[in-house]
Amino acid sequence: MFFKRSITVMLLFFLLGAASPLLAQEAETPSQAQDEIDSILYGEAGVGGVIQRLGKVESDLFGRELPGSISERQLGLLNFIRNGTLGQPSMVFKTGVAEWAVLHEVRSDMPLNRRISEIERQLEGAAGEDRPLAMRLERILSLLITGQVTWQDVRVPANMVFRASFIDRISPKSAAAGDVVRLKMEDHLSIEGYLVAPRGSRIIARVDKVKPPRSFGRPSEISFVFDRLEPLGPEEIPVFLGDAAVLASKSDKTVAAAAGTSALGFILLGPIGLAGGFLVKGDAQEIPPGSVIYLETSALSNVKGYPVPPSLKGLLESSEYNVSEDSEGTETDTNQEGGVQSEQD
């Protein structure tokens, strides 16, 4: 009975989402749209024709293929999986809430099917891979949370400071301008009881410039520009490395201590709004994964947040460095790009 009721409700939201084209941005071609759907769900584009791949996704999610044109079905899937529909949070949002409740962090770099399987293994010892994926997620949520998972509009102010760490290993020898650099949140970001971005939420930066070693023994350099934080919802939060973040780095004893080691240090490069960042020195030839940096939001952002119920409030309070609206930094000029520069001896 639970299975049939859950599938019926999910199919209703799916069909309503397909009729609401403003909730998603369509890709240029059916193949591109399908690649995007496959990547979110499986981590890579599928093989075969679009119709075959589309049918597989629907069967994996709902246990059956759905009616409608290719574009309607793909739009409905993108809304159901990533964007949400008519007040109903997306699968990505719900999965993040479940991960936060069980693991106290999200695993944004894993495909959705693996994320759900890992939660099942944590709770029940095995993944229920013989059942439709959407139903499996709803069952997980019914075990963790009383009532339905909802989301609300939340305003994230500019200049909120938070800790992040590098996921990727960065070396001036191998980096090239334009390379994507991944970081993750080290703490939960919440606004007045609404969970916006749990620990583990992904942050995207890019390599801006790379300079090879120069004359007179001057070291090679690599600089980064920070782009965005990807919260629970489908929106993006712009971030940068500004004065408030640099001040927080200096005030953090752990991070400040790293500045005195041979592995990692901080340098400041200019006035407010310009780059501050890392200096790789001594025997170190790279920025290793796990290197901590403070960043801050660069503009006011409207995003979706999870209204944390009283039974789960302790998960927010248990985070030693939980970020809240009270940690909003001072006003700074965010019209200039903030970045990180690394130098290699």
Regions found by a protein language model. Give the residues of each.
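Contiguous beta-sheet cores, especially beta-hairpins with glycine/small-residue-rich turns
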Residues: 150-268, 273-345
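Bacterial N-terminal signal peptides that target proteins for export
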Residues: 1-10
